[in-house]
Amino acid sequence: MSPLPLLISLLAGCGTDPVQEDVAAYHDAMTPLLAKNLVLAQGFLDVASKVKKGDTDAPQIAERLVSEITPAADQLRAEAEKIEPVTPKLGEAHALLVRAWGDRAASYHAMSDAWAQNDPAAFDLARKKNLQSKLDEETFFQTVNTIAQPYGLLIDQYP
């Protein structure tokens, strides 16, 4: 028996791993978005700390939420929606992130409205929705890094 068929089958199987390629492409696509996410989080934390300290009056907080924070959250969600992983598990994890970032953007809109209308109950409800979106985002990072880790990659939440 000729060793040629075995050699051909071995060479055919030596191609790159499609999951590894997808994870690497995903890592590269997500890194700039995660950098923007870090800037967004820092901006929101700045506003939140001012609210907590009472440093800023209601119109200024609402204006910053409306003019800076909320549009950045909307844009980030829209950019994330454009990324379409090929691997089903990676796609499912990414869908969780897109949903979390969408919920966060919606909570920022609701906080802006509640703050402008001086409605503490509505603000608290929006704040709780924001906290849940953060938990969902954490679940995403755990899930996606379980997928990426075998390939020596980390989807870094704080690049």
Predicted feature residues:
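C-terminal motif of bacterial Sec signal peptides marking the signal peptidase cleavage site
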Residues: 10-13
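Bacterial N-terminal signal peptides that target proteins for export
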Residues: 1-4
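Alpha-helical segments in soluble extracytoplasmic regions
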Residues: 22-101, 107-108, 114-115, 122-159
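Bacterial signal peptide processing site
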Residues: 15-17
